[in-house]
């Protein structure tokens, strides 16, 4: 059964149209932000079959990255990338994205568009010039205009219920100057100010959308929220987002209590103090290793314990068993070729079934909300 939208927030919880707690538990399906401009896997599986597979595992949302570049491409996507979706032959990247959004929401899945990059390619690196919402090729006005177009495009689809405004805020070089991300300081790289501006513009078009605001430094730092919250004209619509990986500053032998302390300092306090929801929009690791008994080490055990203890909303990176083609943004250097194996992916290489049932079982154990309005 589809979640009753629109979604809103109630303290630290996301709630549905009836005020009942919703715990977002999803997967990232990537590729549209990369060189070809379409989600990976459409050469292997029909999009409707894939959407059915996602929903059958119990996931209730899909974070769906795109790039600004992709939205402006008017040439048809080469048929070779759409072999199992022949009805999409001759479509532009945005038309393919539209069709995938429809397939996902037809299965009752919440879709969360995410501006993953301005340019196309693989994210992320300190030197990819895509850490801010503007660079030498993309002006601020273009960023806001494209987001307004996205909001308008899906305003009639109630299951496009949230937007993730900018992936992994970080340093970028713009006009020859190295610029760092800021929060609440009223400088040109103030992400809190940008989220407020873009969120309010989007709400003029679709006031129902949740506005997801990622923390600084690769979405690892939400400490600025303590003194400067994102305040939109429409109340109860802000969700903050963190990302966490084994390399996100965690010692190899970190204790669970130390991990909890680190995560709560970085952003979990927003939950414990009842300020707003926090969504762990990306986390993942080698799926084969995590599926093995005792696999994943202390980070994986600590993360699962944290997600469970604090009843956190989350989204696994990634669904994909294979990559789309991706270069380093701003270069022609290929980092991953189309079809290269993605070790973090949940599916078999042919995209037709779950490749790591033990890992999916671990994720399923964290899907149901334990606390919140209307629970228990």
Locate each region found by the language model.
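Residue-level marker of positions within ordered structural domains that often coincide
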Residues: 32, 168, 245, 312, ...
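Glycoside hydrolase catalytic-domain groove-lining segments
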Residues: 185-290, 298-312
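A short, local hydrophobic-aromatic micro-motif
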Residues: 25, 161, 279-281, 315
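Glycan-binding loop/region signatures in secreted carbohydrate-active enzymes
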Residues: 28-31, 38, 42, 239-241, ...
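Aromatic-rich peripheral "rim/lid" segments of glycoside hydrolase catalytic domains that contact
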Residues: 290-376
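Active-site mouth of glycoside hydrolases
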Residues: 4-227, 235, 323, 341-351, ...
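Extracellular cell-wall/glycan-interacting regions and their flexible linkers
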Residues: 1-4, 16-17, 370-376
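Short, loop-centered acidic/histidine patches that primarily coordinate divalent metals
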Residues: 67, 281-284, 317-320
């Amino acid at each position: 059964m589809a979640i009753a939208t629109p979604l809103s927030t109630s303290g630290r919880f996301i709630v549905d149209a009836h005020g009942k707690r919703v715990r977002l538990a999803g997967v990232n399906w990537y590729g549209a932000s990369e060189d070809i401009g379409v989600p990976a896997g459409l050469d292997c599986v029909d999009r409707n079959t894939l959407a059915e597979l996602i929903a059958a595992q119990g996931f209730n949302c899909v974070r769906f990255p795109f790039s600004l570049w992709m939205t402006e491409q008017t040439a048809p996507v080469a048929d070779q990338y759409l072999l199992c979706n022949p009805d999409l032959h001759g479509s532009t990247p945005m038309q393919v994205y539209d069709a995938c959004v429809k397939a996902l929401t037809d299965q009752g899945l919440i879709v969360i568009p995410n501006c993953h990059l301005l340019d196309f390619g693989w994210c992320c690196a300190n030197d990819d010039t895509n850490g801010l919402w503007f660079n030498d090729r993309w002006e601020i006005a273009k960023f806001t205009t494209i987001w307004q177009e996205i909001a308008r495009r899906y305003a009639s689809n109630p299951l496009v219920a949230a937007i993730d405004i900018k992936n992994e805020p970080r340093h970028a070089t713009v006009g020859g100057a190295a610029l760092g991300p800021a929060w609440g300081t009223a400088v040109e790289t103030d992400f809190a100010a940008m989220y407020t501006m873009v969120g309010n513009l989007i709400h003029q078009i679709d006031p129902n959308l949740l506005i997801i605001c990622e923390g600084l430094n690769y979405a690892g730092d939400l400490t600025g929220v303590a003194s400067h919250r994102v305040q939109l004209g429409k109340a109860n619509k802000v969700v903050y987002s963190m990302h966490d990986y084994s390399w996100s500053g965690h010692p190899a032998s970190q204790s669970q209590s130390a991990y909890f302390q680190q995560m709560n300092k970085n952003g979990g306090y927003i939950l414990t103090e009842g300020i707003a929801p926090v969504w762990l929009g990306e986390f993942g690791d080698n799926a084969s290793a995590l599926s093995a008994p005792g696999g994943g080490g202390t980070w994986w055990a600590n993360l699962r314990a944290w997600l469970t203890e604090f009843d956190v909303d989350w989204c696994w990176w990634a669904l994909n068993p294979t990559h789309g083609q991706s270069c380093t943004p701003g270069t022609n250097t290929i980092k991953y070729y189309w079809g290269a194996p993605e070790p973090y992916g949940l599916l078999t290489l042919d995209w037709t079934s779950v490749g790591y049932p033990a890992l999916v079982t671990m994720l399923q154990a964290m899907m149901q909300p334990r606390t919140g309005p209307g629970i228990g």
